[in-house]
Amino acid sequence: MEFSNNAICKITGRHCVGFNQKNDAQITVEVFDDRFVFKNQSIYLAEYDLDDILNIDGRYEYVEKGSLLYQETEPKFERNYFLEIESFKNTVVLQVEDSSELLNFVEIARELFMG
């Protein structure tokens, strides 16, 4: 998802979501009432309509209060991503094995939301 490509955590207001990898590169997702925006260290990457995301069945589900499991079901991208709430407010961190995994996540987002 330039992605949470993330319905990324609770769609009840504005949230910032950080996808961190070992070298601390980060993609930030700002969730608004009707869209969410991906940025990489303040560089604009993409913007998506929340309705489009919420209409993708089976891709996101809440696993417990404040947590979200992203599950890609296409064989090409058969991975699970667990997003866990950190101690700071409205922030979610996705732990990945290496930078290539983060790039894969970005590609998944493009596939899902840009066709």
Predicted region positions:
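Anionic N-terminal interaction surfaces
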Residues: 1-33, 92, 97, 111, ...
